[in-house]
Amino acid sequence: MSLLKMEYNLYTELKKMTCGQSLSLFNEDGDFVEVEPGSSFKFLIPKGFYSSPSVKTSLVFDTLTTTDNKITSINPTNAPKLYPIQCKVVSEVVSNMRKMIELKRPLYITLHLACGFGKTITTCYLMAIHGRKTVICVPNKMLIHQWKTQVEAVGLEHKISIDGVSILLKELKTQSPDVLIVVSRHLTNDAFCKYINKHYDLFILDESHTYNLMNNTAVTRFLAYYPPMMCYFLTATPRPSNRIYCNSIINIAKLSDLKKTIYVVDSFFEPYSTDNIRHMIKRLDGASNKYHIYTEKLLSVDEPRNQLILNTLVEEFKSGTINRILVITKLREHMVLFYKRLLNLFGPEVVFIGDAQNRRTPDMVKSIKELNRFIFVSTLFYSGTGLDIPSLDSLFICSAVINNMQIEQLLGRVCRETALLDRRVYVFPNTSIKEIKYMIGNFVQRIISLSVDKLGFKQESYRKHQESDPTSACTTSSREERVLNRIFNSQNR
């Protein structure tokens, strides 16, 4: 730990990484406070901040020669086989770590690698190279299985803990596995933090972007007060301010043969309203809609839009154009609505729900990986980050209010490299609720722009449903005619 006075140059360097956000650190009294410019107080500067050689310091950090926490079950022949691009990452990491050891810098590296790159297998390879006892920390239980599979493939002795840190601490009195796979809430226990700081050298923070380290979280406190000897942050969408805790980044672009298309499903809707909708519309401009809760609630009861989403999905699925579908909503009630309707159409052998409230969901996710055809309905919170179903070929985004980081993570669910190259994403920019029409259009346009400009998707308009259904075309025509008549009549008046 480094308690330092906040001099001007140090403050400037740290503040630069927050990208305009407030800078918050632990002070010498252990309080997590905002750092003001010109402050005369001392603050705990994270160890990982000094991993970048561009940060000048006279501090000297311990290297691995000071510990003896080595993996006993390591077998080099079990190291996973990597693609050339993954080997390039390993080479970069090894080269950077040699320089860090030479300069006596902390061995902290952020692996900023695209969704579908294979961060898990690449990191397991690095783990085998280092041969050091390791803690793998994941934000939720759903990510544990993919780590378990890769760690077992490497042949490492490991233990998974999801049932509570107290139980784990009792078990660690009689056993000392080479690899611990835990959920991040374990870090709220100081005794556990002290244990892994003493007995484990390598700490892997999976999906590091899910933690805002400018907040006083368990992960923030762990990295500040119990900093590991070595640390990897893994992410496809790094959070800029988290660099303060892990300031060395490796980012290698990945070329892909995937054919990625985002289909914009446009439709004209007559205004739709119910008592419930009118009640929620009154809350749109209030404080209760600060995070667009009511905007998404309105979308969940927008019956014409929901029917369009279902019609499009059913048509594409029945035609065989898409086979392994992820349907994403923002709200749980919206997820349940789609699940029930799809279940009635296709049955429980095809339709599954990714419900965070169901403890059996992770096991169900494992079981559907082998299916040739399925529809998986879930929420952005549960499946937007880290969902491990590599065979997904299509994504239906039913919500609209999604930030850039979530968009990139979500689209990454259908960008995993497999033998089948076609990937399709469907978005729905229209709504029948006129009070949110422009807002929804703008939010969906942001999804489209990011997918095309940053992730290499090709944008196309989806016309199949309207063209294949003559009654739909007639309905649209008559609707347009009525709208034109109203405009004409109002002008005459």
Curated annotation (Swiss-Prot):
Cross-referenced PROSITE patterns: HELICASE_ATP_BIND_1
GO CC terms, sorted: virion component
Short motif (DESH box): ranges: 206-209
InterPro entries per UniProt: Helicase/UvrB_N, Helicase_ATP-bd, Helicase_Restrict-Modif_Enz, P-loop_NTPase
Pfam family, one: ResIII
Localization of this protein: Virion
Superkingdom of the organism of origin: Viruses
Single annotated GO MF: ATP binding
Similarity section: Belongs to the helicase family. Poxviruses subfamily.
Record note on quaternary structure: Interacts with G2. Might be part of a transcription complex composed at least of G2, A18, and H5.
Record's function text: DNA helicase which seems to act as a postreplicative transcription termination factor. Involved in ATP-dependent release of nascent RNA. Forms a stable complex with single-stranded DNA, and to a lesser extent RNA.
Name recorded for this polypeptide: Transcript termination protein A18
Highest classification ranks of the organism: Viruses, Varidnaviria, Bamfordvirae, Nucleocytoviricota, Pokkesviricetes
